[in-house]
C-alpha cells in the first residue's frame, strides 16, 4: 500500500457535524458524524459512525485499522476532548511472530483480521485518525481478489483472539456486509471546492498539465490544476479514470490542439521523410521539450496531432534506446467520453560514431530515395545485440532486453496502415552488423569452466538429514552422561524455589496490571539465574494459554552473542516484528513502540542475559533498556541478568542506576547439600555413582566456586574415565571415588600442566634442559645452543642417546607452536632465544614422578 498522510507534516482540523445527543451518565456529547479538514486546503472529508478508518501507529507505512463505533466529546475533564470508541483490526505484521504459524497459509498483502479481545482498550483521540479506508468482508470460503484496482481496499475474513485464528461470527459478517451495501459508507464525502471553472476548460487544462508533467524533465515544478485532498494521495496511474469525463469533449479537444500548435514557434520543428536522418545528440544541460511532429505521407498531406500524432522521446544517453510513443484518441459516440489508447514501442538502435553519422547524412541528402525498413530486419538486429549484451551483462540487463524484444514483437503484429504511417527510424548498417556477426560466431579462447556461471535464483533450503538414526544409550554410564549434560532440561529446578516464586510474582503482577517494570538479577556463574528465569517464563506461557494471565510476547537476547552492544536493538526489533534495520533506526522504532501508548499491544517480557557486556562509554544502551519500562503506558518488563553483584554501583552512572529501580535479586553460590540434591535429581533412579563419590564432588565444588555447571562437567568426565578403565580390562561398575579424583585433578589443573604431562619423553627432556639452563645462568632467557648443551648433558647422565641438532630444533618448534615456549620468530638457529610461557613451578609439578 502507498504511504499515508502521516508522513506529511500537515495540520488537520476536526469538527462535529449535526446536533449532539447528551449522555448524562458518562458526561459525554455523542455525535454521528465529524468533519476533517486539512489546513490550507479547501477539501473536507466527512467520516460517519460505522466507517473503517486508519489510525496513526508505530509504522507510518502500515497504520492501524479500526471501525468507528461511537463519536463523543468527553466533558468530564477541564478541557473537553474529542474521542472515539473503535473496534480494532490487526494486520499480520502486528501478530506475534511465535503465533503467525497458526494461520497455516501465507496471508494476502491487503488482508486484515478482526481483533476479538475484550480486554483491549478501544478509546482513542480523533486527532490520531488519518482518514477513511474501504474494508470488504469475505466469507471463509471466499477467495481474496488479486485483481483489485484500488490498492487501499482491505479484506477481512478471519478473526484473531490472541490465541488462534477463527472465521468471522455470522453476526459480525452480516453487519459488515450490510455496511458495504450502504452507499453512505462506501466513499468519503468531500466538500465542494471553492474554485469553480468551466468544465471544458478544466478538462483541457488537466490534459495539458498531464502531458507536460509526464514528459518534462522538471516534474517537481509542475503543479496540479485543481486542488486535491492530501488524504487521497495516490501514485499516478495511466487509466481511463485519470481523464475527467466532461460532456463538451469536442471543445476541449479543439482547445488542446490550439494550445499544442501555439508552441511550434518556440520549439524545434522536425519533419520526417520516408528516409529518416540520424538524430542529433542533445546537450547534457539542454531541456528536451516535446512538440507535435508532422508526419509526411506520400500524397504530401499533413495530419493534425489531434487525429493521429506520434512523438519521439530522445534519450539524453546517446547509446541505444529511442522510445516511440504513439497516442490515439477516439471519441466514443455512445458514452461521449474520450478514450485514449497509448502504444509504447521501444526500438534499440546501434550506437554510431560521428564519422559514420556524417557519411550517412551526406549520402542521404542528395538521393532522397524511398526505402522501407521491415520489422523483421530490425528484429534480427535486436537479436544480435541481445546475444552480445547477454555475454557482458548480468541477469538484470538480460531481463530488460527481453522486455524490449517482446515490445518490438507486439508492435510487429499491428496493421499495415499503422506500419505505413510510422516513419522509419532504424537504418541498417552493414559494416557494424558484419563485425558483430564475426564476433558472435568466433569461438571463445578461454577454457570452459566445469561449473555453470549462473546459479539458481531461488534455491530450496534444506536441513541435513541423518543417514543413520541416533543410537540409544547402551549402558548405564552413557545414559547418565546424557542426563548430566549442561544443556539437558531437567523435569524440575531444585534448590531455587524461593527465587522462582519471587520472579514469578513480579512478572505476574506486571502482566495483570498492564504496566512495565525492571528487575536486576545478579550472581556468580553457574548459580541457576538463566535456568530459573526460563522456568518462570515457561510457567507463565502455560498460564496464558489457560487465561490465568494476559497473553504476552517473550524476547530474549544474550550479550555474549552480540558483536557490538548497539546490535541489541536490531535483535529485539527483529524478534518482535521480523523487520531488519540498522542499530540507530531500530532504536528509534523501539522507543516509539515502548514510549507511546499503544492500546492494543501485548505486554512484552524482555530477558537480557550477560548485561555487563552491553556496557559502553556513554552507557546509552543500558539507559534505554532501563528507561523504556518507566514511561507511562509502556507495557515492557525487563529482566536483566549479570554476573556482577555490584554492577549498578560500580560502573553505572547515577542516571542509569536510578532507572534500574530497587527490585533486585541475588543468587548465592550453591552449598554442598544443594549440589548433591541437584546431582541426585538429575540421575533419578540410575545407580551410576557411589554415594561417597557424589558427596566428594559436591564438597569439592562447593568449597571452590559453588558452580553447578562445573559439578556436572566433572561427573560427566568421571563416567568417561570409568568406561576407559573398563576397556583396559577392569570390570564395569559405578563411578568410584578414584575416578572422580582423577576427573577433579583434570578439571582444576591448568591446561598447560595437562599438556606437559602428555608430552613425549624427548619434549619433557628439553623442558628439563631449559629449567637447568635458567638455574645455571640465573636468567629467564637462553639461546638454543646453551639449551642443547644442557640437553646433551642430561641425556648422558641418564644413559639415554642424545638427539641430533635437527631433532632438537624440531622439538623446540613443536613446543613453541603449543605456546609452552616463547620462541623468537627468526632464523638464528643456534642463537635462537627461548623463554618459558609458564612458570618454572608448573613445569616441575608436571614433570615430577608420581
UniProtKB/Swiss-Prot annotation:
Keywords carried by this UniProt record: ATP-binding, DNA replication, DNA-binding, Magnesium, Metal-binding, Nucleotide-binding, Nucleus, Phosphoprotein
Gene Ontology biological-process entries: DNA replication initiation; mitotic DNA replication checkpoint signaling
InterPro entries: AAA+_ATPase, ATPase_AAA_core, BAH_dom, BAH_sf, Cdc6_C, Cdc6_ORC1-like_ATPase_lid, ORC1/CDC6, P-loop_NTPase
PROSITE patterns: BAH
Site (Histone H4K20me2 binding) location in chain: 94
Region (Disordered): 209-286, 349-376, 393-469
Major localisation: nucleus
Oligomer status and interactors: Component of ORC, a complex composed of at least 6 subunits: ORC1, ORC2, ORC3, ORC4, ORC5 and ORC6. ORC is regulated in a cell-cycle dependent manner. It is sequentially assembled at the exit from anaphase of mitosis and disassembled as cells enter S phase. Interacts with CDC6 and KAT7/HBO1. Interacts with LRWD1 predominantly during the G1 phase and with less affinity during mitosis, when phosphorylated.
Functional description taken from the UniProt entry: Component of the origin recognition complex (ORC) that binds origins of replication. DNA-binding is ATP-dependent. The specific DNA sequences that define origins of replication have not been identified yet. ORC is required to assemble the pre-replication complex necessary to initiate DNA replication.
Domain notes: The BAH domain mediates binding to dimethylated histone H4 'Lys-20' (H4K20me2), which is enriched at replication origins.
Family: Belongs to the ORC1 family.
The name this protein goes by in its record: Origin recognition complex subunit 1
Source organism of the structure: Cricetulus griseus
Amino acid at each position: 500500500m502507498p504511504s499515508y498522510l502521516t508522513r506529511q507534516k500537515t495540520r488537520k482540523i476536526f469538527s462535529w457535524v449535526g446536533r449532539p445527543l447528551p449522555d448524562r451518565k458518562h458526561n459525554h456529547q455523542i455525535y454521528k458524524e465529524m468533519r476533517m479538514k486539512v489546513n490550507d486546503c479547501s477539501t473536507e472529508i466527512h467520516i460517519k459512525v460505522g466507517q473503517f478508518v486508519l489510525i496513526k501507529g508505530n509504522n507510518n507505512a502500515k497504520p492501524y485499522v479500526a471501525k468507528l463505533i461511537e463519536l463523543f466529546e468527553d466533558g468530564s475533564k477541564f478541557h473537553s476532548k474529542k474521542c472515539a470508541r473503535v473496534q480494532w483490526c490487526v494486520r499480520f505484521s502486528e501478530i506475534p511472530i511465535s503465533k503467525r504459524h497458526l494461520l497455516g497459509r501465507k496471508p494476502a498483502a491487503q488482508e486484515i483480521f478482526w481483533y476479538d479481545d475484550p480486554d483491549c482498550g478501544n478509546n482513542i483521540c480523533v486527532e490520531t485518525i488519518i482518514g477513511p479506508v474501504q474494508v470488504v468482508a469475505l466469507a471463509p470460503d471466499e477467495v481474496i481478489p488479486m485483481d483489485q484496482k484500488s490498492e487501499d481496499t482491505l479484506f477481512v475474513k478471519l478473526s484473531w483472539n490472541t490465541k488462534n485464528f477463527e472465521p468471522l461470527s455470522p453476526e459480525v459478517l452480516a453487519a459488515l456486509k450490510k455496511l458495504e451495501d450502504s452507499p453512505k459508507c462506501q466513499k468519503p464525502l468531500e466538500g465542494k471546492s471553492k474554485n469553480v471553472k468551466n468544465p471544458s476548460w478544466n478538462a483541457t487544462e488537466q490534459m495539458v498539465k498531464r502531458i507536460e508533467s509526464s514528459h518534462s524533465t522538471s516534474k517537481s515544478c509542475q503543479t496540479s490544476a485543481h486542488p486535491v485532498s492530501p488524504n487521497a494521495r495516490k501514485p499516478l496511474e495511466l487509466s481511463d479514470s485519470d481523464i475527467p469525463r466532461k460532456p463538451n469533449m469536442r471543445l476541449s479537444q479543439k482547445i488542446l490542439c490550439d494550445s499544442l500548435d501555439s508552441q511550434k514557434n518556440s520549439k524545434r520543428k522536425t519533419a520526417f521523410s520516408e528516409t529518416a536522418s540520424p538524430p542529433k545528440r542533445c546537450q547534457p544541460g539542454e531541456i528536451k521539450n516535446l512538440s507535435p511532429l508532422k508526419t509526411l505521407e506520400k500524397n504530401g498531406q499533413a495530419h493534425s496531432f489531434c487525429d493521429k500524432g506520434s512523438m519521439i522521446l530522445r534519450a539524453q544517453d546517446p547509446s541505444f534506446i529511442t522510445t516511440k510513443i504513439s497516442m490515439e484518441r477516439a471519441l466514443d459516440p455512445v458514452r461521449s467520453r474520450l478514450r485514449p489508447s497509448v502504444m509504447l514501442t521501444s526500438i534499440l538502435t546501434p550506437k554510431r560514431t560521428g564519422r559514420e553519422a556524417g557519411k550517412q547524412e551526406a549520402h542521404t541528402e542528395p538521393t532522397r530515395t524511398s526505402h522501407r525498413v521491415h520489422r523483421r530486419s530490425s528484429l534480427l538486429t535486436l537479436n544480435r545485440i541481445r546475444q552480445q549484451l547477454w555475454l557482458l551483462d548480468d541477469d538484470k540487463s538480460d531481463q530488460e532486453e527481453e522486455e524490449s524484444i517482446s515490445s518490438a514483437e507486439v508492435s510487429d503484429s499491428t496493421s499495415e496502415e499503422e506500419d505505413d504511417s510510422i516513419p522509419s527510424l532504424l537504418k541498417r548498417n552493414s559494416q557494424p552488423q558484419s563485425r558483430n556477426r564475426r564476433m558472435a560466431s568466433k569461438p571463445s579462447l578461454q577454457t570452459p569452466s566445469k561449473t555453470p556461471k549462473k546459479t539458481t535464483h531461488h534455491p530450496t533450503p534444506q536441513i541435513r538429514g541423518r543417514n543413520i538414526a541416533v543410537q540409544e544409550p547402551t549402558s548405564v554410564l552413557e545414559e547418565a552422561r546424557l542426563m548430566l549434560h549442561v544443556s539437558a532440561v531437567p523435569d524440575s529446578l531444585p534448590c531455587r524455589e524461593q527465587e522462582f516464586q519471587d520472579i514469578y510474582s513480579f512478572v505476574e503482577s506486571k502482566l495483570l496490571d498492564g504496566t512495565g517494570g525492571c528487575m536486576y538479577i545478579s550472581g556468580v556463574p553457574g548459580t541457576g539465574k538463566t535456568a530459573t528465569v526460563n522456568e518462570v517464563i515457561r510457567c507463565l506461557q502455560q498460564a496464558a494459554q489457560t487465561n490465568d494471565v494476559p497473553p504476552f510476547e517473550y524476547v530474549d537476547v544474550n550479550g555474549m552473542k552480540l558483536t557490538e552492544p548497539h546490535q541489541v536493538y536490531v535483535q529485539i526489533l527483529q524478534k518482535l516484528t521480523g523487520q531488519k534495520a540498522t542499530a540507530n533506526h531500530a532504536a528509534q522504532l523501539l522507543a516509539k513502540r515502548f514510549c507511546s501508548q499503544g492500546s492494543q499491544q501485548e505486554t512484552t517480557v524482555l530477558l537480557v542475559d550477560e548485561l555487563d557486556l552491553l556496557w559502553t562509554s556513554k552507557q546509552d544502551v543500558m539507559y534505554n533498556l532501563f528507561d523504556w519500562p518507566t514511561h507511562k503506558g509502556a507495557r515492557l518488563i525487563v529482566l536483566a541478568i549479570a554476573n556482577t553483584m555490584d554492577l549498578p554501583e560500580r560502573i553505572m552512572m547515577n542516571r542509569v542506576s536510578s532507572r534500574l529501580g530497587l527490585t533486585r535479586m541475588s543468587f548465592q553460590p550453591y552449598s554442598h547439600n544443594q549440589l548433591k540434591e541437584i546431582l541426585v535429581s538429575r540421575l533419578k533412579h540410575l545407580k551410576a555413582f557411589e554415594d561417597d563419590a557424589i558427596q566428594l564432588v559436591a564438597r569439592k565444588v562447593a568449597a571452590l566456586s559453588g558452580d553447578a555447571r562445573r559439578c556436572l562437567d566433572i561427573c560427566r568426565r568421571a563416567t568417561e574415565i570409568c568406561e576407559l578403565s573398563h576397556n583396559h580390562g577392569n570390570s564395569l561398575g559405578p563411578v568410584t571415588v578414584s575416578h572422580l579424583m582423577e576427573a577433579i585433578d583434570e578439571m582444576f589443573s591448568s591446561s598447560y600442566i595437562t599438556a606437559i604431562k602428555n608430552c613425549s619423553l624427548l619434549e619433557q627432556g628439553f623442558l628439563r634442559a631449559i629449567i637447568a639452563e635458567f638455574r645455571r645462568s640465573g636468567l629467564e632467557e637462553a639461546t638454543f645452543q646453551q639449551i642443547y648443551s644442557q640437553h646433551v648433558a642430561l641425556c648422558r647422565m641418564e644413559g639415554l642417546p642424545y638427539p641430533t641438532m635437527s631433532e632438537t630444533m624440531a622439538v623446540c618448534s613443536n613446543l613453541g607452536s603449543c605456546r609452552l615456549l616463547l620462541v623468537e620468530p627468526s632464523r638464528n638457529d643456534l642463537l635462537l632465544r627461548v623463554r618459558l610461557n609458564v612458570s618454572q613451578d608448573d613445569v616441575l609439578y608436571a614433570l615430577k614422578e608420581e
